[in-house]
Each structure stands twice: as C-alpha cells, then as structure tokens.
C-alpha cells in the first residue's frame, strides 16, 4: 500500500528539498518504488534530481503544473513521469507552477487537485514524497490533502524553533476539514553544526516545544558541504559519498522512520 508523505515547513532554507531527495533515495535503495513530486515553482528538487541534464528547467513543458491545468480545464491528462533510476521517479516543477497557483485559487474544490492526480498513480509506488514551497497557501493545502503523513524539517535556530506554529495551524485545519487521516510522522532537525553548543541548545528547545504529542526524530542531519556538491551533480549524498556524515545520518533517519511503521 502506497504511503504519501509531504515534507513541509513554511520557512525556506530548512532542508525540505535536500531531505525529500535523500530520503527518497534511501527508501529506493531499500527496494521501494518511489515517486517524487516537485511542488515548488523554484524547481530545486527537479534540478537536484539531474533529469534536466543542462536544460533550463523553466523550458520544461511536462510538469506538475501542466497536469493541474488540464484537471482545472476538465481534460485530465496523465502526468509525464521522469525516471531518475530503476526505483526512483519524479514529476518535475518549474516557474509555471506560480501561474497555475493563481488559477487554483479561483477554482472549485481547489484543495483537491493533487489528490485526484495521485489517485491514478499511487498503485504503482510504495512511497510518494511531495516537496513543497516555503509557504502556507493553496499548494501546501493540496499536498496535505493528498498525503497520509507530514514530515516537518527544522533547523536549530531561533526562527525555525518558533516559526512552525502557523504550519501546525494549517495542518490542523486541513486535517479537520479535508483529510481526517492526516498525521505528522515527526520533526526532522537538519543543518546541525554539531560543534556548537548553540545548536545543541536549540535542538533541545525544538524537542521541548513540540511536547510529547509530536515525535522529534532522534537522528539529526549535520551540516556538510558535500551535500551541495552532490546536488550540483544530480546525485543523492549517499551516491556521491556514502561515508559522508550527512549520508550516514539520512540512512539512520530512514531506518528510524521505517521502524515507526
């Protein structure tokens, strides 16, 4: 049975895209069939996946935005799925999503479009991971409505620790009104400079701020320049350097997540 997971935070720069790609890669090497949905008009997940191969992603036509437009216009085209490797696929996104979002905002049942699209795809996958924009608007609600679970990424800084209340409110409103089965799998702390006491203190603040009701994963993702290097060549950090500390951390996090099931 397919599990659909949204990776979310309304703040940018907290490791959403990096986590989505590397978590998907870890699930794939564990013999799972995984589909990535880039749902951010910046298209960073599309860039990181390596499918563009030098092409400007804003020139790509077969994106998630195109599919949503066909659903808005009652044509309902099947999405074009790009293969990253044998077990990992992606539906890309680019700047066209910004225009599509404007159409979504004035569409009937605007919250339901991504769910409708994924209904026809989920039987082909073990996991579908959705990378969202740093916002709290209609595309995030679409992702929540389509999902079974949410993983929240957070960095060990004051803004990240205090800035998730609005995200949690959006989650609760979506759960109440559209998707009663939606749950938060946990909070993953990323971008950790393990050398500093400040980071360690902020990790404790994040853990205590969520309380006992929301899991904060035991494994955290350390800072590593190798992560940006891996993104530049369209590889997961484990594929780029399996002994890197971030690669090991993403592997341990994936194991921790899977033990929850």
Annotate each language-model stretch with its function.
Residues 1-261:
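P-loop NTP-binding core
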């Amino acid at each position: 049975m397919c599990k659909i997971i949204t990776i979310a935070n309304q703040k940018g720069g907290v490791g959403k895209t990096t986590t989505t790609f590397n978590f998907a890669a870890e699930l794939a090497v564990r013999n799972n069939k995984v589909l990535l949905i880039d749902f951010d008009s910046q298209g960073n997940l599309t860039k990181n996946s390596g499918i563009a191969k030098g092409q400007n992603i804003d020139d790509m036509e077969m994106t998630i935005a195109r599919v949503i437009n066909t659903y808005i216009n009652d044509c309902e085209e099947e999405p074009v799925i790009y293969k990253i490797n044998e077990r990992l696929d992606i539906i890309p996104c680019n700047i066209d999503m910004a225009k599509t979002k404007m159409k979504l905002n004035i569409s009937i049942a605007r919250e339901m479009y991504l769910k409708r699209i994924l209904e026809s795809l989920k039987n082909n996958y073990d996991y579908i991971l959705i990378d969202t924009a740093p916002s709290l608007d209609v595309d995030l609600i679409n992702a929540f409505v389509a999902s079974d679970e949410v993983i929240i990424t957070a960095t060990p800084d004051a803004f990240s620790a205090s800035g998730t209340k609005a995200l949690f409110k959006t989650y609760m409103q979506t759960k109440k009104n559209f998707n009663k089965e939606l749950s938060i799998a946990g909070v993953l702390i990323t971008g950790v400079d393990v050398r500093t006491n400040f980071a360690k203190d902020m990790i404790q603040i994040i853990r205590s701020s969520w309380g006992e009701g929301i899991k904060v994963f035991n494994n955290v993702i350390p800072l590593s320049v190798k992560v940006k290097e891996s993104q530049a060549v369209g590889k997961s950090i484990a594929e780029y350097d399996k002994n890197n500390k971030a690669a090991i951390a993403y592997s341990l996090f994936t194991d921790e997540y899977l033990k929850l099931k």
